[in-house]
Amino acid sequence: MSNLQTRIITAIVLGTITLWLTWVGGVGFTLFSIAIGLAMFYEWTELSATRQTAFSRLFGWAWLIVTGILLILDRGALLTIGFLVAGCAILLVTQWKSGRGWPAAGLFYAGFSALSLSLLRGDEPFGFTTIVFLFAVVWSTDIAAYFNGRALGGPKLAPRFSPNKTWSGAIGGAAAAVAGGLLVASLVAAPGGWGVPVLALLLSIVSQIGDLAESWVKRQFGAKDSGRLLPGHGGVLDRVDGLVAAAALLYLFGAIFAEPDVPSAIFFSF
C-alpha cells in the first residue's frame, strides 16, 4: 500500500470519527478536544525533551488535566483561560533557564487548542455549524494544497523547513477553503456578504501558517514527524497543526466580537 493510500484511509477513518463526535457534541466532543490536547502535549514534550525537566513534565500534565476538568465542568471560558495562562506563566518563570520557553509554549499550545475546539462546538444552535465550517475550510485547504502542489509544482513556499510545500499549493488551498466555507454557509442559510469568504480565507492562511510553524518546531529538534500514532500522517501534531491554529483564530474572533462562552455566534453575526 502506497503512502498516499495509507494517508487517505487514515484521513477517512479519523474524519468519520470526528464528524460523528461533532454531531453528538456535548461532553463527548469536549472529551475528544481534551484528548487532542493531551496527545499534542505528549508529542510536544517528546519533541522538546532536551528542554524539559521532570518538574516541567509533571506540572504541565497536571495543569493541562485540570484545565480539561474545568472545560468538562463548564466553569466559564474566562476562568479556564485565566487558569491556563497562569500555569504557562509559572512554567515560563520557573523553567526559563532550562527550557527557554518551550515547556510553557507546549502547555499553552495544547491547552488553548483543546479549549478553542471545545468552546467553538459548545451549545446549539451555532456550535455544530461552526465546527463543520471550520473543518470544511481546513480540510479543503489541506486537500487542495496537497494535490494542487503536486500537479503544478513551482516555487517553494518555505524551503528551509518545509521543502514539499509550494506557492501553487498554498494558493490553491486558500481558494478551495473559500469555496468550502461558502458551501457550508449556503447549506445552513447563513448570512451572505463578504464576511464568510473573508473569514474562510483568513482561517485558511492561518491554518497553513500553523502547518509551517509545526514544521519549524520539528526542524529545531531534528525530527521528521511529531510522532507515529497516525499511519501516513506521522503524529497528532502533524495532523492537527493547521486545524488548531485556525480554531484558535476563530475562537478569538468569536470571543471578541460575540461572546467568550459562545464564540460560535460569530458565524451568524456578519
Swiss-Prot record:
Q: Which catalytic reaction applies to this protein?
A: a 1,2-diacyl-sn-glycero-3-phosphate + CTP + H(+) = a CDP-1,2-diacyl-sn-glycerol + diphosphate
* Primary localisation category: membrane
Set out the biological process GO terms recorded for this chain's protein: CDP-diacylglycerol biosynthetic process
- Where is this chain's protein located in or outside the cell? Cell inner membrane
Query: What are its E.C. numbers?
Result: 2.7.7.41
Q: Which InterPro entries match?
A: PC_trans
What does the record give under GO molecular function?
phosphatidate cytidylyltransferase activity
| Membrane topology, record value | Multi-pass membrane protein
Pfam short name (any one): CTP_transf_1
Q: In which pathway does it act?
A: Phospholipid metabolism; CDP-diacylglycerol biosynthesis; CDP-diacylglycerol from sn-glycerol 3-phosphate: step 3/3
The UniProt transmembrane annotation reads 19-39, 53-73, 76-96, 101-121, 126-146, 183-203, 248-268
Its signal peptide is none
Q: Which cellular components does GO assign to this protein?
A: plasma membrane
- UniProt keywords, alphabetically: Cell inner membrane, Cell membrane, Lipid biosynthesis, Lipid metabolism, Membrane, Nucleotidyltransferase, Phospholipid biosynthesis, Phospholipid metabolism, Transferase, Transmembrane, Transmembrane helix
Q: Which family does it belong to?
A: Belongs to the CDS family.
Under which name does UniProt file this protein? Phosphatidate cytidylyltransferase
Q: Which organism is it from?
A: Brucella suis biovar 1 (strain 1330)
Gene designation per UniProt? cdsA
